[in-house]
Amino acid sequence: MAEFIRSDILGTTFETTSRYANLQPVGLGTAGVVCSAYDLISEQVVAIKKMMKPFHSTSVAKRTYREVKLLRHLRHDNLINMSDIFISPLEDVYLVTELLGTDLHRLLNGKPLESKFAQYFTYQILRGLKYIHSAGVIHRDLKPGNLLINENCDLKICDFGLARVQEPQMTGYVSTRYYRAPEIMLTWQRYGSKVDLWSVGCILAEMLLGRPLFPGTDHINQFWLITDLLGNPPDEVIDRITTNNTRRVVKSMAKRNPRPLKEILPAAEDAALNLLDNLLVFDPDRRISAEQGLMHPWMAPYHDPTDEPVATEQFDWSFNDADLPLDTWKIMIYSEVLDFFQLTTNAEPSGEQSQNQSQSQSQAFTSSQDLQLASMLNLGEGELLPDFAATIDPNKFGSVDYLMDGQSLDPNSFS
């Protein structure tokens, strides 16, 4: 049976397998706490996210199942990848992912990025979205804090807690207001993957501007800021508003003309502004897709259609509308852990230590009469929201160490 070690991280108890050493607090993520740790098998520093009270209610258990399933099945260079997953004796779910140095929110820190960095980051976001959308998944909560970046400028999308299926009719949701597409604010019953492309436009503008483009104080002020830049929404957009009161208010708004983006981004390249013009479009039917964005002239230095893969199959959303009891969701989560364990143990072993670890976990499983011992597995990957003191100097990309409390994380220093 695998050994679990208890640690206190940000006031909460972490129960991790002996595979992980030197746990250090990173911060609070969505519905969980994140720490860094040294993986004794891979000899890499990783991120471990504890999902708080995953079996507290049916809604929380369903969200936990959705995130675990998504992270298990979505594999792409520009998405955070899960390396391990386990369920502790206290029945908390732990997701283990790669650890990147910072996120875009911290990197910006109130300052614009050089155009070349904004360009490369935008390319990677679009490349990741092309894959996600091809799998029939919408992220729904893209924002700078959900875009992780390392010292080589590699970008990975994380936090799939709000991800949903692309379906003809969808309800509203709570996302970060600054990056929320207008069709969400206008209470459309129908929206699709283009909500993510609106978010990309807001993020690109923020990288060039150094501050949020639409920093609304509430949803009304948010919409006002959007119309102040883009003008009034066209009639075909207004006609699709399903709430009579909202439609009446939007129709009664004073006439506003669109302002040129050059007015607020005078130093931006024309090609970058043109891409923004195609992303920040009221009508999602006229907003470009991720694939079209990759083919935009501003993406030409990086665009390679042979290296922008799509998913090999659609993600299975058959569970999404299921109204199941808590115990059933719990069993389904354990099943995902088991499947992950079987795949990893059938994969090529990485040395004697890894093989011994797999054998130990297998013995823990087969000797158990309770699914609880699925916790002996290593489950992995969830969203990562790094809130630690990592810094990257945009002028010195490629030579930056991960920082924690001002100290470089040197794997050789772990014992």
UniProtKB/Swiss-Prot annotation:
Activated by tyrosine and threonine phosphorylation. ATP binds at V26, G27, L28, G29, T30, A31, G32, V33, V34, K49. Dually phosphorylated on Thr-171 and Tyr-173, which activates the enzyme. Residues 20-299 form the Protein kinase domain. The modification Phosphotyrosine is found at Y173. Its EC number is 2.7.11.24. A motif (TXY) lies at residues 171-173. The active site is at D141 (proton acceptor). One of its GO terms (biological process) is cellular hyperosmotic response. The modification Phosphothreonine is found at T171. SUPFAM superfamilies: Protein kinase-like (PK-like) (SSF56112). The keyword Ribonucleoprotein does not apply. Keywords: ATP-binding, Kinase, Nucleotide-binding, Phosphoprotein, Serine/threonine-protein kinase, Transferase. This is Mitogen-activated protein kinase mpkC. Mitogen-activated protein kinase required for growth on media where sorbitol or mannitol is the sole carbon source. InterPro entries: Kinase-like_dom_sf (IPR011009), MAP_kinase (IPR050117), MAP_kinase_CS (IPR003527), Prot_kinase_dom (IPR000719), Ser/Thr_kinase_AS (IPR008271). One of its GO terms (molecular function) is ATP binding. It holds the Pfam family Pkinase. One of its GO terms (cellular component) is cytoplasm. It comes from Emericella nidulans (strain FGSC A4 / ATCC 38163 / CBS 112.46 / NRRL 194 / M139). SMART domains: S_TKc. The gene is mpkC. The lineage of its organism: Eukaryota, Fungi, Dikarya, Ascomycota, Pezizomycotina. Its cofactor is Mg(2+). Belongs to the protein kinase superfamily. Ser/Thr protein kinase family. MAP kinase subfamily. HOG1 sub-subfamily. It catalyses: L-seryl-[protein] + ATP = O-phospho-L-seryl-[protein] + ADP + H(+); L-threonyl-[protein] + ATP = O-phospho-L-threonyl-[protein] + ADP + H(+). It comes from the Eukaryota. The TXY motif contains the threonine and tyrosine residues whose phosphorylation activates the MAP kinases.
